[in-house]
Amino acid sequence: MEQAWRWYGPKDPVSLSDIRQAGATGIVTALHHIPNGEIWGIEEIKKRKTEIENAGLSWSVVESVPVHEEIKTQTGNYQKWINNYKQTLRNLAQCGIDTVCYNFMPVLDWTRTDLAYELPDGSKALRFDHIAFAAFELHILKRPDAEKTYNQEEQVAARTYYDNMSEQDIAQLTRNIIAGLPGAEEGYTLDEFQTQLDRYKDISSEKFRTHLAYFLNEIVPVAQEIGIKMAIHPDDPPRPILGLPRIVSTIEDMQWFVETQPLPANGFTMCTGSYGVRSDNDLVKMTEQFADRIYFAHLRSTQREGNPLTFHEAAHLEGDVDMFNVVKALLNEEYRRLNQGETRLIPMRPDHGHQILDDLRKKTNPGYSAIGRLKGLAEFRGLEMALKKVYFNK
């Protein structure tokens, strides 16, 4: 696999030099300074690409070209934003970039309640606490009909949790959930957040699927024509939250996805940390069944806690994910492609990482500190080497 690394551009505290020293060769990045929906111009793409190449690296994957909210709700100028998206893809292809990761999650990108959860060894991880999230919905946001989402036991627990929160706790939880995370292109106030949620109040999962299908049928033929692989990222966490529809969460969703738009350019980002939160998701089966449509891999593990809807991000080779067999399945697919004459390796990045060692004293992007990801990348490099020697005679 191609060893890649997510970089948030010139303002990222982890530099391109740091990344090269970590052993990665591919960069996963985006033009974060361009507003959602606007066209990425060729000059801006070339400028970023040149910056990366001058550091001895290559721009391997775009993560992400954001999908404008009006595309997701099919309101306002959604057709304009779709046309802009097509032009951005054409411009990327003209600059030699061939893989685009994106998501179709409404309102929020990935969601956590704690961005600095301390583990027994003193390292810090990202965590999603189901009861804390319920307290936010029920008592801070006060989302209409939120009580229908939670059973009586959960509502009582959420009330107790909220009653024990200080004003500082409330402000911190609110910021963690709605203020935007690295890679999320939107940040909201509480009122703005509810306004965004209200845009989806009449959009069921079934209707939302028709919106995704429309987007796919507009975009994927263009991607197919120009040689770009589209790799949709799953919902994170992979279940409905905040009353919003979530439609890229299970193996059934993946099957619907490829049947809806069967062109080969229509594929997946296999994010083990997102899909793996659900105990009913068999990640090895998902990887094997859709191997020929996996164009990008985020390798990360999570650990479900006593409440199975609560989880924290585990060390990369620990937790609930069968990483050994997932990586083995990815290598099987990679060798199948190579045997058929393809030369492109599957780009893989260590997704997130614990905040450890010297990074505990630094300001870092949540989940994207340097040393935790360096550790994860080294572990995956070793796992890949061992698998190749034992199973692939390489």
From Swiss-Prot:
Keywords: Iron, Lyase, Manganese. One of its GO terms (biological process) is D-glucuronate catabolic process. Its EC number is 4.2.1.8. Its cofactor is Fe(2+); Mn(2+). GO terms for molecular function: ferrous iron binding; manganese ion binding; mannonate dehydratase activity. The keyword Manganese applies. Pathway: Carbohydrate metabolism; pentose and glucuronate interconversion. Pfam families: UxuA. SUPFAM superfamilies: Xylose isomerase-like. It is an enzyme of class 4 (lyase). It catalyses: D-mannonate = 2-dehydro-3-deoxy-D-gluconate + H2O. Catalyzes the dehydration of D-mannonate. Belongs to the mannonate dehydratase family. This is Mannonate dehydratase.
